[in-house]
């Protein structure tokens, strides 16, 4: 039952990444289990001159290195903290160097290790009000999944508004609210370089609605309207490179190494595909209600 709940809660019908025989997967939690690829360690993968994927083969955690310290966007599952710190060390980043943690949303597979990372590094967390509330509850009383996918709670240190910017070491991170998958879902954009040339990176949150009641949802009455706005928001992002919390959603394959982003989607293609799937889910729900 617990596995089934998590499958509805977090899995978004993505292709599993290939696992590596050289790396032993991180252990499953006792409370619930996830696909093994979500726990498959990987070495840091370079996305741009200062941006690295340091999570697992099927969960994104982005490290952005600046002259004034590092920024982490998402952390994956609760048991990933030590793996992330090891990958930071491989990039020359000490625990004290981690200054800021940003979130796509506050589900267990993206905010799971935040409490431990804060304790071990002293990093501050910035999130919008909706994500901050869910983070402080450790994912409990989720709008769709109740207490099925909890994790150690943590407090946000800074509440951000839509369009707000945070600058670390000359790199400007902009928050773009894209409510839907959760009310606090957020895309983050910044400009890095590749071989000295500017590249605009968009880290856009999930646009899936796995098992959600879309119409007449008593806990989220404006869900459909929020999703529609978020599809438009993602299409309009400054976006030379798109990454997503679950890499398969944007056609990244982290296990492919240097060719990991060879088939990556544009922001427009990502939003278009997600909206088409959403419309199909909505039509099926409507038909079932007749």
Swiss-Prot record:
Activity control, per UniProt: Inhibited by Hg(2+) or Cu(2+), and by chelating agents such as EDTA and O-phenanthroline. Reduced enzymatic activity in presence of cobalt, nickel, cadmium, and manganese.
Stretch forming the signal peptide: 1-21
Cofactor detail note: Binds 2 Zn(2+) ions per subunit.
Organism of provenance: Stenotrophomonas maltophilia
Binding site for Zn(2+) 2: 109-110, 246
Description of how the protein assembles with itself and partners: Homotetramer.
Places the protein is found: Periplasm
Name of the protein: Metallo-beta-lactamase L1 type 3
EC number: 3.5.2.6
Cellular compartments per GO CC: periplasmic space
PROSITE patterns per record: BETA_LACTAMASE_B_1 (PS00743)
Keywords: Antibiotic resistance, Disulfide bond, Hydrolase, Metal-binding, Periplasm, Signal, Zinc
UniProt-listed GO biological process terms: antibiotic catabolic process; response to antibiotic
Binding site residues for substrate: 205
CDD domains assigned to the protein according to its UniProt record, in alphabetical order: L1_POM-1-like_MBL-B3
């Amino acid at each position: 039952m617990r596995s089934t709940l998590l499958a509805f809660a977090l899995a978004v019908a993505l292709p599993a990444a290939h696992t590596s025989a050289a790396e032993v997967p991180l252990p499953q939690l006792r409370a619930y289990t996830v696909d093994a690829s979500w726990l498959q360690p990987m070495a840091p993968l370079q996305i741009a001159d200062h941006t690295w994927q340091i999570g697992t083969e099927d969960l994104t955690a982005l490290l952005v290195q600046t002259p004034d310290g590092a920024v982490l966007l998402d952390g994956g599952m609760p048991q990933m903290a030590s793996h992330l710190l090891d990958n930071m060390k491989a990039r020359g980043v000490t625990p004290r160097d981690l200054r800021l943690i940003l979130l796509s949303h506050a589900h267990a597979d993206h905010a799971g290790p935040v409490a431990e990372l804060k304790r071990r590094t002293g990093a501050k967390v910035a999130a919008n009000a909706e994500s901050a509330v869910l983070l402080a509850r450790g994912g409990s009383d989720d709008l769709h999944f109740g207490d099925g996918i909890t994790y150690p709670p943590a407090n946000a240190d800074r509440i951000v508004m839509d369009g707000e910017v945070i600058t670390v070491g000359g790199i400007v991170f902009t928050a773009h609210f894209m409510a839907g998958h959760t009310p606090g879902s957020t895309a983050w954009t910044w400009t890095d370089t590749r071989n000295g040339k500017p590249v605009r990176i968009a880290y856009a949150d999930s646009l899936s609605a796995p098992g959600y009641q879309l119409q007449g949802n008593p806990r989220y009455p404006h869900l459909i309207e929020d999703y529609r706005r978020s599809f438009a928001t993602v299409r309009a992002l400054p976006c030379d490179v798109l990454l997503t919390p679950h890499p398969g959603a944007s056609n990244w394959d982290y296990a492919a190494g240097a060719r990991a982003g060879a088939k990556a989607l544009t922001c427009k293609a990502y939003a278009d595909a997600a909206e088409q799937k959403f419309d199909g889910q909505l039509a099926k729900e409507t038909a079932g209600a007749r």
